[in-house]
């Protein structure tokens, strides 16, 4: 034996010796102990991890989950049913006995065949999915497959998010086990079938039955049940109404057959039923009958803005996220009590629909567009401005598709001259710059005025002439653009915008000049919508009957949760002080003139006082009228969705409609007036200079130029008229060969006596706070700081010609028909 062989044999003997075998055994022993300890440690860590996830799970609110079976409902102002809430996520709740057995079995067969056997989770299914997921991890696919039972899917839809993660899956499994302890299988299945996503905006089998087959869920046949059962796995892929599936229906047809096969395999349907259904699909496919009116509510114009407002108020009060409030509104069983007067809402709709109201605009008011909607449109809003409750809101004419844009609430447009009481004359009076009897010159802008207002070219009046000296009352009655520009220039753009924003108007970045504040010409950039609508205007004009206080408009009175607890309550109005009571009354009194003797006479109805203002936008593309009575405020808009010029004037069309709908709103109401506040007086002024009159102002050959109108105490002019002088009156008489001055006046022609105020026209002499502090907070009092035009005299008399009549100027007391 060689030496090498002897060494090998010795080593082998040593290796097999009892001592070495003991070492191997010891190693294996400790190895397995280590593995065991490692396994126990891992299991412990995983256990604590799972436990921590379970502890972080949201609390299971069984009542909240069951409330998913309670639709939110809207009621009118009398507490009568009005609408079910239909959000963009459409869901119609049905009871268990309304759901066909075939539909229940279809879902169980394809989604969770051991549903009636497990306690919330399917262990057998979980084991298979775990193996598949481990394989995916090892292969690098990182795909997490689900093993969700119907109970787990309900938990995911009702409580958790759609996040794909192990943490969410663990929470889902734990909560599913808990839910099964509280609800029966039928309760779980019914709630699941009412909430399962079914493609598009449809949630629940009832909404899906309507969308695909225009049927109540209880009327579905076997094939239709099988189709809906298979849809939920991949709603987009199996959507039989999609264009791609219309061209190639094999995907959803095969899926439906798979559901039928599984139902037959589990014994839910007989062989005969199965074979007949398969033959029907092979021969005729699946017959769909889509319902295009699925998402339309009974009171579309009022209901959708109400839902929008309730959502916003819930988010503001309870700090809900958008997703949370969407689910609460859609599924939370809320009871929303609206302020809608059902009869008034229906009757206002009838008035707006009536083609006879638009004959002055077009010979074919009912011409329709490609969507079968009237081209000529209108909107209207009526508000109880004391409470802020909206009584009627109509967003368009005629029958329109669901989710049509609401012209009364959502659309923003230019408002034309309807802005003048809100951002011109109201602020001017409120800031102490004048009163109803103050005078402004309706004449071309001077170079200084062109510069300060930013106009490059001379702006014009709608009536294409100049009227000379006008009182505020007359200027707003005839809607003088030049007068409004001059007064707005004194108020200041920033002041006007501050008032306008508080009143609800929206000013975009390109709508912050004097053409907007004086004339209501908003840019309405599609990327920055601005302006107003009938909802904002009706609310804004209410301030003139409510002591200058704007009550925020509300479409609902209260909102209750599914247990009857009050979530929202508008019984206490949200109020914002805009103008002083004195300002608001004076503007209200001025606005009555356009209805009593101006271009808006048809707005008058019965014996109820009416005040209002017309509005026309550039190019006659929008007609508006906004106004109020001692009871309600309202606004009307008429125009085309694709703007075009209209061939008449705003007052001719809008004011009759205003009169009709407000007549309906005031049916049975007694005469009353807006209460006159203390702190205002009717003061004598000269209607040419706007200053305190002298006896010479009565000797004008045109007749006495002395005029009485409302001023806030302390704001009337304190300087005497410097327009009517002896020489001025004599020149008038000489130039006009006037013999109309009576002997009494001849005796007085050398005197300049003060005209005393009419004591009968004075109210309580308590002086109100007429300081510009009444302006909105943190707003400068005047942008331009011009020294003239402040107080009673808005025009420098020295700039007036003596013979005004030769310059196309007519006197303010003449009858004027104005388009605006």
Curated annotation (Swiss-Prot):
Molecular function per GO: peptidoglycan glycosyltransferase activity; serine-type D-Ala-D-Ala carboxypeptidase activity
Skewed-composition ranges (Polar residues): 808-820
Example of a GO cellular component annotation carried by this entry: plasma membrane
Region (Transpeptidase) location: 378-663
Localization terms from the record: Cell membrane
Role according to the record: Cell wall formation. Synthesis of cross-linked peptidoglycan from the lipid intermediates. The enzyme has a penicillin-insensitive transglycosylase N-terminal domain (formation of linear glycan strands) and a penicillin-sensitive transpeptidase C-terminal domain (cross-linking of the peptide subunits).
Family in the record: In the N-terminal section; belongs to the glycosyltransferase 51 family. In the C-terminal section; belongs to the transpeptidase family.
Protein name: Penicillin-binding protein 1A
Species name: Clostridium perfringens (strain SM101 / Type A)
Lineage, uppermost ranks: Bacteria, Bacillati, Bacillota, Clostridia, Eubacteriales
């Amino acid at each position: 034996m060689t030496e090498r062989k002897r060494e090998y044999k010795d080593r082998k003997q040593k290796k097999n010796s009892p001592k070495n075998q003991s070492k191997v055994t010891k190693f294996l022993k400790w190895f397995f102990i280590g593995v065991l300890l490692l396994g126990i440690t891992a299991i412990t860590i995983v256990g604590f991890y799972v436990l921590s996830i379970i502890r972080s799970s949201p609390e299971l609110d069984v009542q909240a989950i069951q409330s998913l079976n309670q639709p939110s409902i809207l009621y009118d102002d009398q507490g009568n049913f009005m609408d079910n809430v239909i959000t963009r996520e459409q869901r119609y709740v049905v009871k268990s006995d309304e759901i066909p057995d075939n539909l229940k079995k279809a879902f169980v067969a394809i989604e969770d065949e051991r549903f009636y056997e497990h306690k919330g989770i399917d262990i057998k299914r979980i084991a298979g999915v775990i193996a598949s997921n481990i394989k995916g991890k090892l292969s690098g696919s990182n795909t997490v497959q689900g093993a969700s039972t119907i109970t787990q899917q309900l938990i995911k839809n009702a409580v958790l998010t759609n996040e794909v993660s192990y943490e969410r899956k663990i929470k889902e499994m734990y909560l599913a086990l808990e839910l099964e302890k509280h609800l029966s299988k039928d309760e779980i299945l019914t709630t699941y079938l009412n909430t399962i996503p079914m493609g598009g905006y449809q949630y629940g089998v009832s909404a899906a039955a309507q969308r695909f087959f225009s049927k109540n869920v209880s009327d579905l046949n076997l094939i239709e049940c099988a189709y809906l059962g298979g849809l939920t796995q991949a709603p987009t892929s199996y959507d039989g109404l999609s264009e791609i599936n219309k061209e190639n229906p094999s995907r959803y047809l095969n899926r439906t057959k798979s559901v039928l096969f599984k139902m037959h395999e589990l014994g839910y349907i007989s062989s005969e039923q199965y074979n007949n259904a398969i033959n029907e699909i092979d021969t005729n496919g699946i017959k769909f009958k889509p319902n295009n009116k699925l998402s339309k509510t009974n009171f579309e114009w009022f209901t959708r803005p109400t839902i929008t407002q309730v959502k916003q108020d819930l988010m503001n009060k309870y700090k809900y996220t958008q997703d949370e409030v969407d689910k609460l509104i859609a599924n939370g069983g809320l009871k929303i009590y609206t302020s809608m007067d059902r009869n008034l809402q229906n009757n206002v709709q009838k008035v707006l629909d009536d083609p006879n109201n638009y004959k002055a605009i077009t010979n074919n008011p009912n011409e329709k567009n490609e969507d079968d909607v009237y081209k000529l449109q209108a909107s209207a809003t009526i508000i109880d401005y004391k409470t802020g409750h909206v009584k009627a809101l109509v967003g368009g004419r005629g029958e329109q598709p669901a989710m049509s844009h609401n012209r009364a609430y959502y659309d923003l447009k230019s408002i034309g001259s309807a802005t003048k009481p809100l951002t011109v004359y109201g602020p001017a009076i409120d800031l102490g710059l004048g009163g109803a009897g103050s005078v402004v010159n309706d004449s071309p802008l001077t170079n200084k005025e062109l510069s300060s207002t930013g106009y490059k070219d001379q702006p014009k009046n709608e009536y294409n002439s100049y009227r000379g000296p006008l009182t505020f009352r007359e200027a707003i009655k005839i809607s003088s653009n030049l007068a409004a520009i001059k007064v707005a220039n004194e108020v200041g753009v920033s002041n006007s915008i501050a008032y306008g924003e508080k009143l609800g108007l929206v000013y975009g970045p390109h709508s912050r000049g004097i053409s907007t504040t004086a004339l209501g010409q908003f840019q309405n950039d599609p990327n920055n919508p601005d302006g107003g609508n009938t909802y904002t205007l009706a609310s804004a004009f209410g301030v003139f009957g409510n002591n200058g206080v704007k009550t925020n408009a509300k479409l609902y009175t209260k909102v209750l949760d599914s247990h009857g607890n009050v979530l929202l309550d508008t019984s206490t109005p949200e109020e914002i002080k805009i103008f002083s009571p004195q300002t608001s009354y004076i503007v209200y009194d001025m606005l009555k003139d356009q209805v009593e003797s101006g271009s808006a006479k048809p707005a008058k109805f019965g014996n109820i006082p009416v005040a209002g203002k017309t509005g026309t936008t550039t190019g006659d593309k929008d007609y508006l009228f906004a106004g109020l009575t001692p009871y309600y405020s309202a606004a009307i808009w008429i125009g085309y969705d694709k703007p075009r010029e209209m061939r008449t004037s705003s007052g001719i069309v809008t004011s009759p409609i205003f009169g009709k709908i407000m007549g309906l709103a005031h049916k049975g109401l007694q005469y009353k007036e807006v209460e006159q506040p203390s702190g205002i007086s009717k003061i004598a002024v000269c209607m040419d200079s706007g200053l305190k009159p002298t006896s010479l102002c009565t000797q004008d050959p045109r007749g006495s130029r002395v005029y009485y109108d409302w001023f806030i105490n302390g704001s009337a002019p304190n300087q005497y008229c410097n327009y009517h002088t002896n020489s001025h009156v004599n020149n008038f008489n000489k130039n006009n060969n006037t013999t109309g001055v009576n002997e009494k006046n001849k005796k007085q022609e050398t005197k300049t006596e003060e005209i005393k105020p009419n004591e009968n026209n004075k109210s309580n002499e308590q002086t109100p706070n007429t300081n510009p502090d009444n302006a909105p907070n943190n707003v400068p009092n005047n942008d331009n700081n011009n020294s003239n035009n402040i107080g009673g005299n808005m025009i420098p008399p020295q700039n007036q010609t003596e013979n005004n009549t030769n310059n196309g100027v007519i006197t303010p007391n003449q009858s004027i028909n104005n388009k605006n």
